[in-house]
Amino acid sequence: MTIPYLLLDDARAGRARLYRDHIRRDTLAAADLDQLDALLARGWAEGLHAALRIPYEFGLALMELAESAPPLVLDWYARLDQLHGDAIDAWLRDQHDGAPAGLLDLRFDTDRAAYARTIAAIHELIRAGNTYQINYTLRATAASYGNPIALYQRLRALQPAPYAALAWHPADGHTLCLSPELFLARDGDHLHTLPMKGTARATGDIEAAKAALARDPKNRAENTMIVDLLRNDLSKIARPHGVSVSDAFHVARHGEVLQMTSRVNARLRPGITHAAILRAAYPCGSITGAPKRITMQYIAALEGSPRDLYTGALGYIEPEEMRLNVAIRTLQITDGHARFGVGSGITIDSDADDEYRECQLKAAFLRHPPDIGLIETLRVENGEPQQLDAHLARLAASAAALGLPCDAEAVRTEVIARCATAAQPHRLKITLPRDGTPHIELAPLDAIARDVLVCEHGEALPDRDPLRRHKSTHRTHLDRIWQTAVAAGAFDALLYNQSGYLLEGARSSVFLQIDGAWHTPPLALDILLGIARARLLAEPALIGTTHITESRLSRADVARATRICLANSLRGILTARRIARP
């Protein structure tokens, strides 16, 4: 979907608000926040529906801690649908084709040693008496493959969240938010917040683990600090004696994590505007620490990159009603690049190793792969699997990237045992499913001619698809392409991307001789790291040259090539002649 939309999704209760028919986007700098209510009144008078998107750094400018910061965003939609139960899943399913979607190579920007050094620095700041708790956060990056809406639907099932959101806007890319935390809820003159502080792993006897977390002195102390901060924030806009705390130290499960919350309530003074509420409370104290202002200064110095929407807020706003989440557990995906933030509250009692593990735990739900596996296909000669080391190395690397378990040495042992009696050439196929249990198939391999035909596939593939770098079980479309080519008398079909560059064959790597020099497409085009390709680059003499250049090659380059070679591990190096499309 490439039209702006917003789904505010209570996946636990099975209800959602779907905003569509985007009309316009208003933005407000922090210095202009008092104009918010006038903007709201104008949009509501037009019969439109308002949604808020507030980056964390807006709060820095609001507190005059930054000269410039990204603005508050107010999106206006003409249509609002209330969805319930299966209708939410049905709408999500309608937005994608069911192909696998996930993340590859999820990496944190801070290793354990660097993290420990920062925690030591935070402890020094706390000892100096200027802060009691600092919410220190890390960034993770990954390559995203498949439809982000399909990824959201899968993550939503893994970790149903009460304050989730899914959105797309050309200025933002895709936002996939699985937040368990409420920032602000307004109903008339009643306002409440549910700050989340206190974390434990959801394992073993869950009820016992919940009770243990609720009793834990360190987590209760963290929670109490933030509750006191938010009581102070809300007292700025509440009636005298109008702030109270209820449901203190409540523990709930969110996927693999247990989280502690306490509820802070406020009765608003007459005439309090939406702008005044945000000015008093934003950003949520649970993601800053205490005291808020100086701790935000420390955060700006300690963290290596902006948080952006992460730890900001997403939600809706109506004349007498407002719901804003704390935008944690939030993926932002732009052009296949995914960003994710995760952090924890650091106090004087915090242990760096424990806190780092907590960050890993909070991100664990991202590492669950979809229903996808890996394939390796290799040639067996005289009972010997050819280039087995290279295939196992690729299998292990791809498994790590996709988050699949893989015992490469166990696979090696099974492969060697299966091949021992294969005197004639055989085809060996290794399939590694999501659970990491390998499946080995061995079949006789018929000989083919060394001179073959190759055709061109007419449909362009996406420019960016990092899953193409891995030989996954999601390859029915590729099998269909080469099988169509075979039916037309060819060995394979050449694939091109939407920019017109040659990628590879549906089952082979491609090498072209142009003006006497040999070329092959670069891995940067998201092509398979072919075993035969790597061997030819290392041993170019195999095709009678001293060097092969990785180049972006167009259809015109293919047309003027004087020689074409196709290569894969099963068939080796083949000389090809180009024919028309099948």
Language-model features, listed with the residues they occupy:
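Extended alpha-helical targeting/anchoring segments
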Residues: M1-N382, A493-N497
